[in-house]
Amino acid sequence: MSQQDQPDRQTLLEIYRKATLLKQNDERFRSVIKAGVLVMPYYSARGQEIIPSAVSVNLNQDDYIVTIYRGIHDSIAKGVPLKPLWAELAGRVTGTCKGKGGPMHVTHPASGVMVTTGIVGSSMPIANGLAWASQLKGDGKVSVAYFGDGAANIGAFHEALNMASLRELPVIFVCQNNGYAVHTKYQYGTGVANIGDRA
């Protein structure tokens, strides 16, 4: 990596600030769930704070992200305000989806968070659709599809990458590989050492 490819100090500090916010919120989520204050499905992103932090500092406010049920940290990094996010998780009408989406379906278009989906692998074709719409409008927006390593083993992954390549879509695919697809270790479910090799 050349010197000019290195992020500047201000960018690094913003990544660190976002990662710290994600870590603090993850700790709070786990604390309130353990205490029984909130009863909800929650998939911790502990140890993955840098990924959405580094991605989000390189996006514009109106760029899109489509994330998965494990993506609360992606939404926070993109800029979803904490008060309506927490209200959503608590099922309150002041939430981002009026309390009807819950933790697995956070949406906040003002921050560019178009959908959080509970269906494994579905973030990729949805992000492609948003990217294609942006391309047709010529508005310069970029879409990001977050997904896990398990989703890289389903058809939607291959179809989405093929479509993005074919149409030269302004879309970025971000695999957050935590080493497990539910309970299956990465090496038992994927035949390549690096998911990026499939692209």
Located regions from the model:
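Cofactor-/ligand-binding subdomain signature composed of acidic, glycine-rich
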Residues: 1-39, 61
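A short, conserved beta-to-alpha structural element at the edge of catalytic cores
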Residues: 167-187
